Structures are given as C-alpha cells and as structure tokens.
C-alpha cells in the first residue's frame, strides 16, 4: 500500500475498451461526484505515493515479501510454536487441481523459498505471499478470541481478519524486522503460557483442552453451496441462467405483508420446508468471521444453510 492518506484513492484505467466504450460516461460520473475544492493534503499524499511506486516500489515490495517469508520461517522452524500454531501453506488452502505449477508452499524448511512466479503464471488460484494465515486452533481459542483477548488487549497487536480457527497477518511496505521479531516473541510467550497451564492442569482440564482443539480444528461446519434464487426473482429471458434480481427482492422486504419471521433456534423452518414451503431470504446474512454472505435477498433457504448457521459460533 503506498504511503498516501487513507482517505485518498486512485482509479486505475487500463482497458482497451475504455476510450471507445465508457470514457464519456466515466468522466460524467467523475465530475458528478468529485469536488471543485478538493483537499490538497490528500492530493499531495497521492502524488507522493505515485512517486514512491515509480522510484522505489520494487525494492519496497521485495522487502515486504521477504518480511512475510521470514515470519513463515520463524514460526515453522520454532519447536515450541509448532506445537500450537501452523502457518497454512498453499496446499492447505488451494486444491491440487487448481495448482498446475505443483507448488505446495512458498517456503519450507528443506528447500527454503520457492519461486512463486510459477504459481502466479500457471495456477488458477494463488496466495498473496505478503499475507500470512496462521492456524491458532491448537491453542484452544477461536480466531476472534485470539485476536481480541490475546493479540490486541494483551500485547497491542492490531489485525483485521480472522476465521473460526485462523488469524491473518498482513505485511506492508512499512513492516520492519523489529515488528516481525515482536510478533514472534508474543507467539512464543503465548505458547510458553499454554505449556505452563497444561503442565499444571488436571486430567479433566487436559481433556477439556483437547476437546476444544479437536472441535476447532476438525469439526468444521460444511460450507453450504448456493441454493438458488426463487423463481419470482429469476430472469424470464429463457436462457436458464441462475442469476436473480436481488434489488427487487431487497425492496420487497420493506412490505411487511410480504414477510414472515421465523426463529433460528427451533425447527420451525425445517418443518416448513418439509411441508413443501419455499422460504426466501429478505436480506443479506453475513456472519463474521468469515465475512461473506451465506444468504442474499431472493435466495431460497435450504436445510444445509440452516445447519451451517447454527454451527457457527461467531460474534457478529
């Protein structure tokens, strides 16, 4: 991320159809939303960021990637950290059929750093090497608890993204070796405290810890497939494509006469589905983490989606 003020942004236009297809509409929209008296501190910071990318961008990004690789190496090679933490590799997150390059990890203890350019050139999906996904379920804590109670409240480390059993560390061009060293030091402290607690734990407490770890790492709720849009919100063009009109469904939800409320805690929705009713979502349902919608307006609610929602132990 260039060192521009956060309120600033750039629109990158590099498309062969831009000039002939949308240039006039783009400028019309731009002039509608822009100000004739912009904040020149923001404008200046954007210009400095552009200059930085042009003159020293490659070097800064290279150091950023090296910092992320050094973090992976430090965690994977530390005997105590390996007991409770695991850096997720490419093979852990991308199925083999989508990795034509055959690369399983950007770094491993035997071969060191792998050439990630092959993955970027050949694979259908590739991971951002500057972001490190750390599995923390081995500590017995879910990602959100580990983020808030351990990293933020106790050690002052700010992160944004979590899942049921992972946290995501995002490096940037300002990441220093000392910040990486501090993070590793914190993880070692956490592992040492866990070791001490387990040494003093009773057999019953140990079993409870093992159950929590097993629940977080192995009993993951199956992610449901997208069901379908209700026929009332499908395109009637005869193409048979699965698209739906979310806008129509969203605003129809404001008509109370068209809506019915069901509790998630009981089996009333399953009973309605078994009786032949099609239940349709009126809004976006976005549990965080992970932060993506599992229901959108106009989508038919399936039993698999209901089971997934009940299995989630999220805060938002």
Model-based region annotation:
Residues 17-19, 52, 175, 301:
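Short loop/turn segments at secondary-structure transitions that flank enzyme active sites
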Residues 1-28, 34-45:
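Active-site PLP attachment segment
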Residues 58-316:
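Non-catalytic terminal extensions of PLP-dependent enzymes
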Residues 47-55:
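Short glycine/serine- and small hydrophobic-enriched flexible loop segments
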Residues 1, 25, 29-34, 49, ...:
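PLP-dependent class I/II
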Residues 11-13, 48, 134, 171:
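Hydrophobic side chains in beta-strands
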């Amino acid at each position: 991320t260039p060192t521009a003020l956060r309120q600033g942004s750039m629109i990158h236009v590099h498309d062969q159809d831009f000039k002939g297809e949308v240039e006039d509409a783009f400028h019309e929209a731009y002039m509608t939303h822009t100000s004739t008296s912009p904040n020149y501190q923001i404008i200046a910071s954007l210009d400095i960021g552009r200059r930085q990318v042009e003159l020293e961008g490659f070097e800064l990004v290279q150091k950023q990637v090296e910092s992320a690789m050094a973090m992976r190496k430090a965690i994977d090679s530390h005997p105590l950290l390996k007991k409770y933490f695991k850096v997720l590799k490419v093979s852990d997150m991308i199925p083999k059929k989508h990795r034509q390059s055959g690369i399983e990890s950007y770094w491993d203890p035997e071969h060191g750093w792998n050439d990630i350019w092959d993955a970027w050139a050949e694979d259908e999906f590739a991971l951002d090497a500057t972001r490190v996904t750390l599995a923390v379920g081995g500590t017995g804590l879910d990602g959100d608890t580990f983020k808030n109670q351990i990293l933020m409240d106790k050690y002052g480390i700010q992160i944004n993204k979590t899942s049921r059993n992972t946290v995501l560390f995002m490096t940037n061009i300002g990441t220093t070796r000392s910040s990486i060293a501090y993070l590793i030091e914190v993880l070692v402290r956490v592992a040492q405290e866990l070791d001490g607690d387990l040494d003093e734990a009773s057999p019953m407490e140990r079993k409870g810890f093992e159950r929590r770890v097993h629940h977080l790492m192995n009993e993951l709720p199956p992610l449901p497939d997208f069901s379908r849009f209700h026929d009332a919100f499908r395109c009637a063009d005869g193409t048979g494509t699965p698209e739906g009109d979310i806008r129509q469904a969203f605003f129809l939800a404001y008509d109370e006469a068209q809506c019915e409320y069901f509790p998630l805690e009981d089996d009333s929705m399953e009973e309605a589905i078994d009786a032949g009713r099609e239940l349709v979502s009126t809004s976006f349902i976005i549990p965080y983490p992970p932060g993506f919608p599992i229901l959108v307006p106009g989508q038919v609610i399936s039993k698999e989606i209901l089971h997934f929602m009940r299995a989630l132990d999220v805060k938002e």
